Swiss-Prot record:
It is an enzyme of class 1 (oxidoreductase). Pfam families: Tyrosinase (PF00264), Tyrosinase_C (PF18132). Cu cation B binds at H258, H262, H287. The gene is tyr1. It comes from Pholiota nameko. This is Tyrosinase.
């Protein structure tokens, strides 16, 4: 039997577009919806290219996909049953060919559908099909997806005869046909995927209002996490996965941020559990953005790629704690009939048939120019999350001018992409994107240059008069203590008594999440040992500067405030309250400066403030010095 060989879309190199822009393009959206309908209706147990079998690569039903098995028999008592690599240095790169597989199969359906159009502009539909790529959901800029993803059970598209038609929306959920016998409760009783379900009963439904509220409340936390990761994490170990990092930063890993999106979207539903998350159609919008952030981070850190590590809990192929590196096969994704993709072969997305709008118009052969241009865009997109600290610390500016300050950040001089970035071809190969997507959102506008203001830096690594202290809470716990997904929520100010109000409280600052397989009987040894420790960070500075009413961000002002006002709670995915014995919440202050010509704020040595949480349940275990 021949393998499914993953090459990406051949012929052209085209942009993957942000979902808010994508849905505005009638041809793209109409073709995408129809293709997803076809994928979702393919008999799941009979075709490795069906939506169900592609989703099943990630987790359940823990069976071989495309006949790919390991050298040793899979042992459900010692290793994770899906192929996906979580808690591993391979996390970012394993998901790249996974999204590529999905895109490749989807694109074949898109082309077949475009060929059926009988309209006078059929050639335009065929061209749109050639240019269509999997869209991404940039939750760091827009945490609440458009209605076409989370609200509308039906959508209006243009059919093959050119007429508008209302159809069932395959982005809203996936309907199992049938529910797989491997699914545990409550998934075994739900005929469709659910997001933030209103109960665990068989008649549960999506709670769209709660989903929106949770994502909206998490926006600032997600944005600041993303900016900090892109600008302050410079080693692959700290960037790639949610296990305890290299100890040098106060920033979350890509995987940790990704975990939070899963838990926020899913709650007690499918996206909140790695065993069944990939069956929710939003999964690939989410992971396409994870892939985009991998591209942005790699551009800002040229030459840094996969470093050696281990497989943590293992996979369907890899035993637990097996050594992995840049050459480890990314199973089950074949690049030929006899070999698999490895991390070293997927650094250049243009060779895989796609790019992202941020890279349009750039000379990809000039790493330093690309670094400067991408840094420029990252500042525009997400920089306000950190530059509010400068605003709060600079009386001449004031905390109310965060947006204008972010626009005045000094940038390294480099050619910026053109204003219509989403329409420009990447270098070296052209990407032909329809004019309908040219008036594209913040991602294109982010490339605009701006004047450079004067900034003064003091000696000794302390903040200058135009610098500030950046305040961060570090959260550490054992990943498997509960055996299911959960969140540690941080508040500045009183915590509501009703847990239903926690995530929408005005005092909620942010959270760190555990994205945990809850399927009993699989990876039982990992779950029973419960000794995998993960860490995450919640950035406090923006909230303090905008809500605390303090005169500065210096330690003598902020430390007593945090001692009195910082609180935390543990919330399980099913909405129940938890007591996490392994929890340790501690606080760091990091002096930040913005030297003239620097691309990003420059952190000094972080300083522990153990006294803020020491002596409290779940607080710092370190003695106050």
């Amino acid at each position: 039997m021949s393998r499914v060989v993953i090459t990406g879309v051949s012929g052209t190199i085209a942009n993957r577009l942000e979902i808010n822009d994508f849905v505005k393009n009638d041809k793209f959206f109409s073709l995408y919806i129809q293709a997803l309908q076809v994928m979702s209706s393919v008999p799941p147990q009979e075709n490795v290219r069906s939506f169900f079998q592609i989703g099943g690569i990630h987790g359940l039903p823990y069976t071989p996909w495309d006949g790919i098995t390991g050298d040793q028999p899979f042992d459900p008592n010692t290793q994770w049953g899906g192929y996906c690599t979580h808690g591993s240095v391979l996390f970012p790169t394993w998901h790249r060919p996974y999204v590529l597989l999905y895109e490749q199969i989807l694109h074949k359906h898109v082309q077949d559908i475009a060929a059926t159009y009988t309209t006078s502009d059929k050639a335009a539909w065929v061209q749109a099909a050639a240019n269509l790529r999997q869209p991404y959901w940039d939750w760091a800029a827009n945490a609440v997806p458009p209605d076409q993803v989370i609200v509308s059970k039906k959508v209006t598209i243009t059919g093959s005869n050119g007429h508008k038609v209302e159809v069932d929306n395959p982005l809203y959920h996936y309907k199992f046909h049938p529910i797989d016998s491997s699914f545990p409760r409550p998934y075994s009783e739900w005929p469709t995927t659910l997001r933030q379900p209103n109960s665990s009963r068989p008649n549960a439904t999506d709670n769209v209002a709660k989903l929106r509220n949770v994502l909206r409340a998490s926006q600032e936390n997600i944005t600041s996490n993303t900016y900090s990761m892109l600008t302050r994490v410079h080693t692959w170990k700290a960037f790639s996965n949610h296990t305890v990092g290299d100890g040098g930063s106060t920033s979350n890993s890509l995987e940790a941020i990704h975990d939070g999106i899963h838990v926020d979207v899913g709650g007690g539903g499918h996206m909140g559990d790695p065993a069944v998350a990939a069956f929710d159609p939003i999964f690939f919008l989410h992971h396409c953005n994870v892939d985009r952030l991998l591209s942005l981070w790699a551009a800002i850190n040229p030459g840094v790629w996969v470093s050696p590590g281990d497989s943590e809990d293992g996979t369907f192929i890899l035993p637990p704690e097996a050594p992995v590196d840049v050459s480890t096969p990314l199973t089950p994704f074949s690049n030929t009939e006899t070999t698999f993709w490895a991390s070293g072969g997927i650094t250049d997305t243009t060779k895989l048939g796609y790019t992202y709008p941020e890279f349009n118009g750039l000379d990809l052969g000039n790493a330093q120019a690309v670094k400067a241009a991408i840094g420029n865009i990252v500042n525009r997109l997400y920089g306000a999350s950190v530059f509010s600290g400068f605003a709060a610390a600079t009386s001449a500016i004031g905390a109310g001018s965060v947006a204008s300050l972010a626009a005045d950040v000094p940038l390294e001089k480099a050619p910026a992409p053109a204003p219509e970035a989403a329409a420009q071809p990447p270098v070296p190969a052209p990407a032909h994107v329809e004019p309908a997507v040219r008036a594209v959102s913040v991602h294109a506008a982010a490339a605009q240059p701006h004047a450079e203001p004067p900034v003064h830096v003091s000696a000794g690594g302390h903040p200058s008069p135009h610098g500030f202290y950046d305040w961060t809470a570090r959260i550490e716990f054992k990943k498997y203590e509960f055996g299911s997904s959960f969140s540690v929520l941080l508040f500045l100010g009183p915590v509501p008594e009703d847990p239903e109000q926690w995530l929408v409280s005005p005092n909620f600052v942010g959270a760190h999440h555990a994205f945990v397989n809850s399927a009993a009987g699989h990876c039982a040894n990992c779950r029973s040992q419960g000794n995998v420790v993960v860490e995450g960070f919640v950035h406090l500075t923006k909230y303090i500067s905008e809500h605390a009413g303090l005169r500065s961000l210096n330690p003598e002002v902020v430390e007593p405030y945090l001692t009195n006002e910082l609180h935390w709670r543990v919330l399980k995915a099913d909405g129940s309250v938890g007591q996490l014995e392994s929890l340790e919440v501690s606080v760091y202050g990091t002096p930040m400066n913005l030297p003239v010509g620097a691309m990003f704020p420059v952190p000094g040595n972080r300083r522990h403030f153990h006294g803020i949480t020491h002596g409290r349940v779940g607080g710092s275990r370190h003695a106050i010095v």
